[in-house]
């Protein structure tokens, strides 16, 4: 590029040598003696090429050792490949510096005093975000920008990162190379003694790109892991833009980290009221438990809640808590002793009006034991019990009760046939048939009383034996001998129904054969 294309480093506020304020540095390809009051490397102005604690290269360039510069608090702008004694090739003058510095590693070793120095408040970056700065040492011993753009490829010293505003922060990120990567953040809110410093450039494109940008920060970093690779200027321009924007993305979130870390330190102070509320919450929980579930905590709910109060609470809160807990404990206790610190002046409410204690059966809940009516298999329903009690009373009144075993109801009693007729329970010759099914023969009229006997005494376990013995008793007293006209009529009706049933079965058999 021609001489109007200049690169400037906003170095104001860097106290490099005994309080000397650094101003702006400008460099052009053909200006070896350009403004050298920028980033001072601590090299004396003699042209012999030697420094006090450094070493010399064949061309007379003078450098100090990096470790000593770090100890002295000076800014070192060294490229990885542009170290002293390394031959560099000149590739021409008409080359954009940003293309060569797009992928170049850069370094800044900030002294401890630099972190607190401000950046000029009125400083503005008029150049594009891809403006890069390089520092070399001229033949005269002054640290000037490079003579020719060809040396920018390997001897580039720094990369200019334009970042958003934020607090001063220098951190260390390990990289793959032998040395670490340092980044410097400078706070632009405090003015410096030199006043505003600008990045002068005459490139219209870069000016258009940077016109929309607010006050930016300058961060110079070095990446040891990557090496400079020669290539076309377009590719380097693209990579420079990407690198600059990546730099913005990586640096801009830094203020957020400190903003988020600050509340972390304040959390103990801010959480102390919340801790007090949490300490008060067990009291409220105990009150709710004492009121809602009295049977769960019968006697110690008030004392436990009073003991849960923190020691830091005032007596006023303690008194209020005890008052509220006193009512809860009285609700829970009933006639028992009150809570800790409570007097017996308040009359306890009647225990009958509150829910009872757990495990104690209340007086008003006497109906609950009646719930398991059919729980046990040996018990009988209430209806059966009444019927059996009536039958037992009849058996007691019967004079012939001792003639027949108790498990076998006598068939000669006048009441049993009537019960069997009303219920319609007539069984056939098969003793297992007890439902009002129509028998196949006319004999069931004699077995009708016998069918009742196992039906009524089924729960007692004597189901089958009572069916067989009544046969001789039927011969002694045939049906109808008791003078019951309705039994005779029912027996005739049964015979008619059996005949009809036989006819229906005959017809169904014929239809099945067809």
Curated annotation (Swiss-Prot):
Give the start-end ranges of region Disordered.
1-68, 109-244, 272-484
- Provide the disulphide bond pattern: none
Q: Where is the composition biased (Basic and acidic residues)?
A: 385-405
Q: Which segments show compositional bias classed as Basic residues?
A: 368-384
Protein name (database record): Uncharacterized protein CXorf49
